[in-house]
Amino acid sequence: MSTDVVPISASPTLATLCTAGVLSAADIHLATMVCRLCHESEESVRLALALTSRELRQGSVFLNPRTIRETILTQLDDPALRGLMDEQTAAAIEQVEQMTWPDPDHWMLTLQRSPAIADRRSASNARPARLDSDRLYLERYWLDEQTVATRLAHLAHEKTSITDDQCRKVLDEVQETIRQPHFQLDEFQVDAVRAAATHNVSVLSGGPGTGKTTMVCIILAVLASADPYLGRIALSAPSGKAASRLRDAVASTSHALGLKPLPTASQATTVHSLLGWQGPGSGFRYDKLNQLPYDVIVVDEASMLSVSLMARLLDAIGARTRLILVGDPDQLVSVEAGSVSYTHLRAHETVIDLVC
């Protein structure tokens, strides 16, 4: 059941979608404001912008106009949902199911010609929204996605001063100090150490019990042994509870393995605290002009970071900082819009899938 009051400015189509719970009043207000500021009179453009705002609430940073109708109808065809709705909402949903939607091809052409929407080649912040292939973004989120893709690719391409041979030698030395009998890294774990030691960004992916914490401890030990001048190490996670778990897990695992303690890694913070969150309107203390003072940054539960927060983190990472992202692909998604894809990093062999 929708609890939103339908805005007076809503067209019949937008009003029906709002009553059915597909759109919120805020979605309609945003789309109306953008169209008014950009002198856009096409109702299909206002519909697309309102649906793009809706997609943000659903966890996606973009709208695909070609598939949104099927997506919405599938979501509305939920027996559990229908059992909770009142008669007004049920009637509105029936109207949505019978509603005539814009023809996808014509809709795309209209969006391409809109004064409110930039294309992929336009300058940054030229217009409030942007159409990139079949994806319609609000400009901020398109820029964040571009920042993440560009910065991750750059970090993955940059090799560190540690060679493969040096990494292998140091790893053998570290394994000799481990006091657990018969301890031996498997092929995936060795690849994880090599990726983290020889690249400025690496991703350790795996579910519970795949040894992610053990690998973080060994990687940090290898980095410390390979570089006697290794400076500050930061441990971080999206939430305070996750950061505390990471700190405790690294400390206990390092002790159990008999690894040398790393005092610089004894503290853990949220990603917001790491970046120096200064409150609404003030942004972060650390950014591309004032970068983080760490040699290594480990981020646990990285799969829960939003695209926007990852963009801010990558902006604040300098050329000499190693970033180690740890995550479970089956974890809950970010509470904010967008999830980060690491697919393009696989070509650089910096994404390691750990298995039990």
Describe these PLM feature segments.
Residues 2-349:
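Conserved ATP-binding/catalytic motifs of P-loop helicase motor domains
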